[in-house]
Curated annotation (Swiss-Prot):
Name this polypeptide is given: Flagellar L-ring protein
Lipid-bearing positions (S-diacylglycerol cysteine): 19
Gene encoding the protein: flgH
Known partners and oligomeric status: The basal body constitutes a major portion of the flagellar organelle and consists of four rings (L,P,S, and M) mounted on a central rod.
Source organism of the structure: Cereibacter sphaeroides
Chief localization: membrane
Length: 222
């Protein structure tokens, strides 16, 4: 019985070790590629011997930019943000007062003058700064053509390095005219962009505090 309890406790302790990998693997399911729906072969798509076909882009069409569900478009990441903030405040206050008391109250023991002074001061400063950058390229798929003609894109890239995984995920909306002739769009032209760079595995877990330490830090009064 005690051995079974020991094994159960060990399993509970080891379970969080693979938590990040499990969570990100499950999250990857929501970023699965979207493929165009295969429609039944229509009469107007059958070969007729003519050069022009309304269902094909043709051999002589030079514009190969993404335009339909399932098409691939390359995103050029050029993200760089920086922000800084500083604040300072100071204040001072000084007051003096004197009261001339009647001799009847002081019994003639002093000059009858009661004086006092206060001097207060405060000074505080604060500063904060943050910067980040992301550069690189990845290809994503068109998942939906919106009524206005804009394209909803989504995709992810998985990199496995040693004992860890790196996920690069992107979701957003682009205008067809913002896609260059080389079928590349820069990340700053993506509306409602959701860019994620997430690490999972042993390397990422070592950079985070364990679940026990996080729990103790919540309840600790120090």
């Amino acid at each position: 019985m005690s051995r079974r309890m020991s094994l159960t406790a060990l399993a509970l302790l080891l379970a969080p070790a693979a938590c990040s990998t499990y969570v990100e693997d499950r999250a990857s399911e929501a970023w699965a590629p979207v493929y165009p729906v295969e429609e039944a072969e229509r009469l107007d798509s059958l070969p007729t011997g003519g050069i022009y076909s309304s269902t094909s882009r043709g051999l002589f069409v030079s514009d190969r930019r993404a335009a339909r569900v399932g098409d691939i478009v390359t995103v050029d990441f050029d993200e760089k943000f920086s922000a800084s903030k500083s604040q300072s405040a100071s204040g001072s206050r000084k007051s003096d007062y004197a009261i001339d008391l009647p001799d009847a109250l002081t019994l003639g023991l002093d000059d009858g003058v009661l004086d006092n002074s206060t001097d207060q001061g405060f000074s505080g400063k604060g500063a904060a700064s943050q910067s980040n950058s992301l550069r690189g390229r990845m290809s994503v798929s068109v998942t939906r053509v919106l009524p206005g003609g804009n394209l909803e894109i989504m995709g992810q890239k998985l990199l496995t390095l040693n004992n860890g995984n790196e996920y690069v995920r992107l979701k957003g909306v682009v205008r067809p005219e913002d896609i260059g002739p080389d079928n590349v769009v820069t990340s700053d032209r993506i509306a409602h962009a959701e860019i994620k760079y997430i690490g999972a595995g042993d390397t990422a877990d070592t950079a985070n505090a364990g679940w026990l330490r996080r729990g103790l830090s919540v309840v600790s009064p120090l």
